[in-house]
Curated annotation (Swiss-Prot):
EC class name: oxidoreductase
UniProt keywords, alphabetically: Flavoprotein, FMN, Monooxygenase, NADP, Oxidoreductase
Known function: The FMN-N(5)-oxide reacts spontaneously with NADH to produce FMN. Requires the flavin reductase RutF to regenerate FMN in vivo.
Gene: rutA
Name used for this protein in its record: Pyrimidine monooxygenase RutA
GO MF term (any one): alkanesulfonate monooxygenase activity
TM region positions: none
Top-rank lineage group of the source organism: Bacteria
Organism, as annotated: Methylobacterium radiotolerans (strain ATCC 27329 / DSM 1819 / JCM 2831 / NBRC 15690 / NCIMB 10815 / 0-1)
Amino acid sequence: MMRSHADDSAEARPAPAMSVGVFIPIGNNGWLLSENAPQYRPSFALNKAITLKAEGYGLDFALSMIKLRGFGGKTEFWDHNLESFTLMAGLAAVTTRIRLFATAATLCLPPAIVARMAATIDSISDGRFGLNLVTGWQKPEYDQMGLWPGDAHFANRYDYLAEYAQILRDLWETGASDRKGAYFQMNDCRLSPRPQAPVKIICAGQSGAGLAFTAQYADYNFCLGKGLNTPTAFAPVVEKLAEASARTGRRVTAFALFMIIADETDDAAMATWAHYRAGADAEAIAWLGAQGAADTRSGSDTNVRQLADPASAVNLNMGTLVGSYASVAAMLDAVMTIDGVEGVLLVFDDFLKGLDAFGTRIQPLMRSRRHVTAAALPEVA
C-alpha cells in the first residue's frame, strides 16, 4: 500500500472529524476531459441518484457548479449543463439530511433575486441550503448573452462580489437593504420570508484577492487539491486563508477538492488513471488554456491558472488520489493533519460506482470518518 503523508504515530491519536461533500456532475462527463473516461449527459435523475446515495453513506453536503458554456472538443466537454438553483431545489425536495449548495453566476443574477431563491430553497430543504458565489472568469459564458462587463472585470471582480455578498447578508439577516455602491443600488429592497437557518456562503478563492474576500464574507473556502497522491500539498493556501481570517477576526475553514480513482490495488487504479490520460481531449484542453490566458489582469495564483495548467489538464489539475481503497483512505486521513481544514469535496471518475466504493470500501477505513461509520446508516439504494 502507498503510504500517506500522515506520520505513522498519528495512528495512536484521535483523528479530527472530516466533513465530506460530493461535487455533483451538473455538466456532461464530470471532471475528466478524456475520450477514455465515462461519457454521459447530466440529468436530474442521475444527480438525484448520486445525491441520495451520498446521503445514504453519511456524506455531509452536495454542491453543484454553474457553467454556461463548455470547452467543445471531441467530448463536447461541459457543452451540456443543467442550472444550479433549479437542480438543487429539486434535490431539496427529495432529500432529508444532506446539506445542499447551489452556485450563483453573479454576473447573471441580481443579488436580491438570489437572496429570494435561497430563501425559497431554504424553505424546501428545511434549512439545509447554502450558496457558492463565483465571480465569472470565462468571458464566452457571459459575452454570448451580452452580460460581460468588460475585461476590467478580471481586476475588480472581488469588489463587485463584495457588494453582492453585503446585499445578500442585509436581506437574509434584516429583510431589507438600502445599500448603494459602485455596482448595485438598492432602494428599500425587501425580502420576506427570510431563511429559517443561516445561509452559509462558500467561495473558491485561491488568489490573494479571493482569500481576502472569503475571509471577510464567506464561511468556507474551497481549495484545489494539488498533484497526484500529495494530499497535503495545498497546505500553503490554507495558511494564507488563516492569515486573511486573522485580519478580519472571522473563523473561515477550508475544504479541499480531490478526484478519487480507487480500485482493489494501487496498480489497477493507476492503470485506470493512465488510460484516462491517454485519451485526453486535446481540443477541449486547448480551449481551457486559451480562456485561462485571457485574464491578463490577475496574478499567477488564481484557480484558473491551476485549472488550465497543461501538466494535468485532463482533470482540470485538481488534486488526484489514485490507489487501492486502503491507500486512498490513508491519503484522505492525511488531509485532516492540516490545521484549518474542515473536510473535502470529492469527485469521482464514475460517480455512482465511486460513491459505492467510497461508502463501502474507503470510508470504513478512515479514522477521520469514524463518527459516521460508528453510527448506523440508512440502507443505500
